[in-house]
């Protein structure tokens, strides 16, 4: 059996080019006193393992969990610069201009994140260049501790 195919001369995915996904968001969570709510030393801290991430996929809110990943919920705790914060991977695997991600801090408190992505090489290169939290643009903006694509959330 023989098979043959002709390469489309248009914009197609080229497997010889690298896949680049620069989409992570670094979120610092504080109370109104400026105390880090991801630190167990802070009263009423938020246990980062209890935070849930949902993607809006085809009008359905889908909870993210993949046991095979280092960060199965697409949320990782970072502990550097004498601080703790979370890195979130927002929804980026579609062609929507502003895909939606929900962060559920607890059963009563959910924030909405929308991102804009620069997409090239038929989607093999994706870079988050703008972020909105609950409708307000937070990136580009003032970076926290000089951390790229970071912002504060006050709870």
Region spans (language model):
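Bacterial Sec-dependent N-terminal signal peptides
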Residues: 2-24
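Residues at beta-strand starts and edge strands
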Residues: 21-23, 97-99, 111
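Solvent-exposed, low-complexity, repeat-rich "mucin-like" stalks and linkers
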Residues: 24-35, 56-58
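Short, solvent-exposed loop/turn motifs
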Residues: 36, 59-63, 109, 137-138
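Glycine-rich, aromatic-bearing surface loops/beta-hairpins
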Residues: 111-155
